[in-house]
């Protein structure tokens, strides 16, 4: 990722190419792939299958999640700007993975347990964007609260048949865009 940013900056500096660099953080929403290895699709998939939720590590690591419509709005504003340095687009509201697992259980109305497994090597303890530039330069902040976005996301996946749920991609998203 850093190499790509360096190449982009070089094209801007040496060739005058109009560029934008966006750093996105944990985007989620309807139509995401349930098998992509990230925590939201993993928890939703496990909940829908009636499986216990798997937390890697002790669950104290934190993440922040940005609903897809907020992410798109931030990227759009960056594209309309003339700012060529990196800008973080994400929601800085953090939650521990353990607390998030409990939120998913509450959201789904199920009785699954949370099970803990060894933390993968190099898994960050915190992933929270500093969105100061997005606020100052783009006038952007995330608007959709995690609870609201997760409800929309869960309801989308809950509405799918088992066959649709098993698909790699989900094409119909018209009713989930604000």
Regions found by a protein language model. Give the residues of each.
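C-terminal substrate-binding subdomain of Rossmann-fold SDR/epimerase-dehydratase oxidoreductases
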Residues: 26, 47-178
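Aromatic/hydrophobic pocket-lining residues that form π-stacking "cages" and hydrophobic walls in ligand
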Residues: 4, 8, 43, 101
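Active-site Tyr-X1-5-Lys
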Residues: 1-20, 48-49
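Short-chain dehydrogenase/reductase
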Residues: 1-5, 37-38, 65, 94
């Amino acid at each position: 990722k850093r190499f790509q940013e360096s190449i982009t900056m070089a094209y801007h500096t040496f060739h005058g190419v109009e560029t934008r660099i966006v750093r996105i953080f944990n985007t989620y929403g309807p139509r995401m792939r349930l098998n992509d290895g990230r925590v939201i699709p993993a928890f939703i998939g496990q909940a829908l299958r009636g499986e216990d939720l798997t937390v890697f590590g002790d669950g104290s690591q934190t993440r922040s999640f940005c609903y897809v419509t907020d992410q798109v709005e931030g990227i759009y504003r960056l594209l309309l700007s003339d700012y060529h340095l990196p800008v973080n687009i994400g929601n800085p509201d953090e939650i521990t993975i353990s607390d998030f697992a409990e939120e998913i259980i509450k959201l789904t109305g199920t009785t699954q347990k949370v099970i803990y497994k060894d933390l993968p090597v190099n898994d960050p303890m915190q992933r929270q964007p500093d969105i100061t530039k997005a606020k100052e330069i783009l006038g952007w902040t995330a608007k959709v609260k995690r609870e609201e976005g997760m409800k929309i996301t869960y309801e989308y996946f809950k509405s799918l048949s088992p066959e649709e749920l098993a698909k790699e991609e989900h094409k119909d998203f018209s009713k989930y865009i604000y």
